[in-house]
Amino acid sequence: ELQPSKTNMLTLTLAWKDLQFISTYATVKDGISYIYDHYETNDSISFFQTRNLDRRYMNFSANYSPTLFKIWKPALQVNFTKPFISYNNQKYNKPNWYFEMDHLIELSKSFNVGCEIDYTTAGHTDNDVIYYFANSYAELYCIKTFLNNRLRFNLSVTNIFNTSREKWQINTNGIISNKWNDNNKRTFKLTVTYRFNESKSKYKGTASTDE
């Protein structure tokens, strides 16, 4: 029978101008994890179930988001996670790094271009026994507005280099399960949004918008 989880977390945040540091240490009592196991009377039959597992993890992140030359807004994020999880004398403790770099250039009040690039190293998550393989992603977009920002066009290209995949593995009780999802192909997308006239509520005086 599953027990309710209990989490104790300590977080420290330091910020100075455009720079921010965040560190977290957490312990989870009776956390919920997904486990593969053998059927009691037949080892050739395996099944998937949830179990309570105690775990701990540490997380450190640094964020830098300045405004340069009045129009360029880069944002850099570096994140490190170290889990501490064990089950049946097997450890699931491999740490992982996450890097993200965003760029937004405001060419005018009505025209912006930007990109997002991120990369994740292989490692275990902080909340389960799943092992994720390395993954990278890149996106490019431009936004143009008309009619005092009422009409908005957003043209984007997602997964530019076709490198983003969902690939992970669960290895418990001698049973290995792999998943490789290759459906996230490069995509060209155009989104058009129109915002209608704002009308004020006669009760609270707040503006409401229909899109």
Functional labels for PLM-detected ranges:
Residues 25-27, 31-40, 77, 85-93, ...:
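Outer-membrane beta-barrel translocator domains and adjoining extracellular loop/strand segments
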Residues 10-16, 60-66, 101-105, 140-144, ...:
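Residues on the lipid-exposed face of transmembrane beta-strands in outer-membrane beta-barrel proteins
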